[in-house]
Amino acid sequence: GPPGAGKGTQAVRLARTFRIPHISTGTMLREAVKSDSDLGRQVKAIIESGGLIDDALITEVVRRRLEGPDVVDGFLLDGFPRTVPQAEALDGFSTLQGPLVIVEIVLSEADVLRRLAARMICSECGTNAQDDVEVEFATCHDCGGALVPRADAAEQVLKNRLEVYRRQTVPLVEYYGGRPTFCRVDGAQFVDRVTESILNSVDAVRAC
C-alpha cells in the first residue's frame, strides 16, 4: 500500500496477534541513521528527500535478518519488498518456509496526503504514532517519548514519496496480484476494522 496507508500500525497489531517477529525495514534504517555512520548519513539523505533505499542494500539487510532463529514459526515484513527486484529476491531466499501471504492496504491519494501531513513520530524510539490518542497527548505508547512531526512531512517531500510509490511500488500489485495468497483491504476504514479485514483475509488464504 502507499505511504500513510497504515502498514506500520497494522504490522504491529498483526505481529502481536500471531506472536511472530515484526521485521520493520524502517526501524532498521532509522537505527542506521541514529548511528551517524557513513551508511546512516546516506540513508538519512535519501529518506529526507522522499526516495527509496537501493534494492541491493535493503535486500541484504532483510536477508540477514531472516536468518535469525526467531523467524522459524513465521514473521511479518513491514516495508519490504517495495520494488519488483526486491520481491524477486525475497522469493529466492532459502530461509523461506511455506507460501508468503501478501496484503495490499488500499488508500486514495487524497487520504494519503492528508494522513502524511499530520504524521508524528517518537523522538526517542522512532516509532510512528499509531492512533489519535497518542497524537492528542503527543506521547509515545511504547516508550513515553515526545512525539514530533516527521522529517519527511513537507508538502514537496510527500509528493515525491507518492511519485516514487507510483513508479516503483505499484508494479508489485501486478507481480503478486495473480497469486492465491494475495489479499486487498480497504485502508480508509477505522484502524480496528482494517485489522479485522486483514485477519479475515489471512484466515481465508490459510484455509485454501
Residue ranges and their predicted role:
Residues 1-208:
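Glycine-rich phosphate-binding loop of ATP-dependent small-molecule kinases
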